[in-house]
Amino acid sequence: MTHQTHAYHMVNPSPWPLTGALSALLMTSGLVMWFHYNSTLLLTLGLTTNLLTMYQWWRDIIRESTFQGHHTPAVQKGLRYGMILFIISEVFFFSGFFWAFYHSSLAPTPELGGCWPPTGIHPLNPMEVPLLNTSVLLASGVSITWAHHSLMEGNRKHMLQALFITISLGIYFTLLQASEYYEAPFTISDGVYGSTFFVATGFHGLHVIIGSTFLIVCFLRQLKFHFTSNHHFGFEAAAWYWHFVDVVWLFLYVSIYWWGS
């Protein structure tokens, strides 16, 4: 490696953005094929390439940051700005779903029966599984904060315990959401109510799965002593993302489950 007199990381050419983009194309096309033609081939191919890309990209970043020392304070500052901008873009992403929901529900058209929920739709009881889901995510927000404080204090054992609890709660949330979808008395095809409900809660569920994966990687890295109290941006980014997922759920619960029912 040539000698450099600056603190910035000159990234090597990487195939993972391209394979990641291709996997996203395969997954979205595969979703359409699954919905319309009941074929899961493209979707499976997309998920497989996505998992391979994630594994190899994460491996490269861990190698560059932990073992080669490329993540200097200047690089970490750039990564922090990047993560903040990414979360802001996600806020706008979900804003679109809330806009669609409120646009449809605040002024229901005659086709919907002039009321919300539309005629013939039996909404889910917000005081049952959705309320349990809310408490599960709020508890996971507490445990991820506990993990962060434990890491800052150099308490590895408590950090691992708290991280394990957070991951378990994330998986539990996903299972509860899956059971709720399975038992829901309406489908994604049931007009604008079904569309807005399943797209908004489904995308949030996808974000919970992504966040849980991120936290699992952090857990495995902590088992290998990768994080220190002053060098742990990977974990910090995962924690920020998890808090974002938490806050989005509170808005979903209040808007779609409670007010919308």
From Swiss-Prot:
Its EC number is 7.1.1.9. The keyword Transmembrane helix applies. Keywords: Membrane, Mitochondrion, Mitochondrion inner membrane, Translocase, Transmembrane, Transmembrane helix. Residues 1-15, 67-72, 153-155, 224-232 are mitochondrial matrix. It catalyses: 4 Fe(II)-[cytochrome c] + O2 + 8 H(+)(in) = 4 Fe(III)-[cytochrome c] + 2 H2O + 4 H(+)(out). Disulfide bonds: none annotated. Residues 35-40, 106-128, 184-190, 257-261 are mitochondrial intermembrane. It is found in: Mitochondrion inner membrane. One of its GO terms (molecular function) is cytochrome-c oxidase activity. GO terms for cellular component: mitochondrial inner membrane; respiratory chain complex IV. The chain crosses the membrane at residues 16-34, 41-66, 73-105, 129-152, 156-183, 191-223, 233-256. It is an enzyme of class 7 (translocase). It holds the Pfam family COX3. PROSITE patterns: COX3. It comes from the Eukaryota. CDD domains: Cyt_c_Oxidase_III. One of its GO terms (biological process) is mitochondrial electron transport, cytochrome c to oxygen. Component of the cytochrome c oxidase, the last enzyme in the mitochondrial electron transport chain which drives oxidative phosphorylation. The respiratory chain contains 3 multisubunit complexes succinate dehydrogenase (complex II, CII), ubiquinol-cytochrome c oxidoreductase (cytochrome b-c1 complex, complex III, CIII) and cytochrome c oxidase (complex IV, CIV), that cooperate to transfer electrons derived from NADH and succinate to molecular oxygen, creating an electrochemical gradient over the inner membrane that drives transmembrane transport and the ATP synthase. Component of the cytochrome c oxidase (complex IV, CIV), a multisubunit enzyme composed of 14 subunits. The complex is composed of a catalytic core of 3 subunits MT-CO1, MT-CO2 and MT-CO3, encoded in the mitochondrial DNA, and 11 supernumerary subunits COX4I, COX5A, COX5B, COX6A, COX6B, COX6C, COX7A, COX7B, COX7C, COX8 and NDUFA4, which are encoded in the nuclear genome. This is Cytochrome c oxidase subunit 3. It comes from Rhinoceros unicornis (Greater Indian rhinoceros). The gene is MT-CO3.
